[in-house]
């Protein structure tokens, strides 16, 4: 596990690894995570990388350099792209976790339709 994270977060991730009851269902599976550098997505990436079973994690990100800095030496594959455009990924994917979202509060007020469209198009793509 990446050691450059807060000790409390590290302890929480270890606890998830110990108590999550469905690890066997994820053994040797691949999980594609949109919004992987966001709050929810990054926690899912870290939790899956801390799993006591082999899980292939594919992080869909807009900025690979930012993602690599965030995840350090964690065993993550990267798919670079924008969630509002069709995803170009040729590998096998067993599960998709769509966590990408517009998070700027101002956007909800100034661009409400685009905010919702981003979430909807991300699901379609």
Name the predicted role of every residue range.
Residues 1-31:
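Non-catalytic terminal and boundary segments that flank Rossmann-like NAD(P)-dependent oxidoreductase
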Residues 80-118:
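NAD(P)H-binding glycine-rich loop region in Rossmannoid oxidoreductase-like domains
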Residues 32, 58-60, 79, 116:
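Conserved Rossmann-like nucleotide-binding pocket used by diverse enzymes
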Residues 30-50:
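N-terminal Rossmann NAD(P)H-binding glycine-rich loop of SDR-like oxidoreductase domains
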Residues 53-67:
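Conserved glycine-rich Rossmann-like NAD(P)H-binding loop of the short-chain dehydrogenase/reductase
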């Amino acid at each position: 596990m990446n050691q450059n994270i807060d000790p409390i977060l590290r302890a929480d991730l270890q606890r998830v690894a110990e108590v999550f009851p469905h690890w066997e269902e994820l053994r040797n599976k691949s999980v594609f995570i949109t919004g992987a550098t966001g709050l929810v997505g990054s926690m899912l990436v870290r939790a899956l990388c801390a799993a006591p079973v082999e899980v292939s994690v594919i992080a869909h990100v807009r900025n690979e350099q930012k993602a690599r800095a965030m995840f350090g030496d964690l065993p993550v594959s990267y798919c670079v792209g924008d969630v509002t455009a069709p995803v170009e990924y040729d590998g096998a994917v067993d599960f998709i976790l769509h966590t990408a979202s517009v998070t700027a509060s101002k956007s909800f007020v100034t661009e409400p339709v685009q905010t919702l469209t981003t979430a909807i198009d991300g699901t379609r793509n």
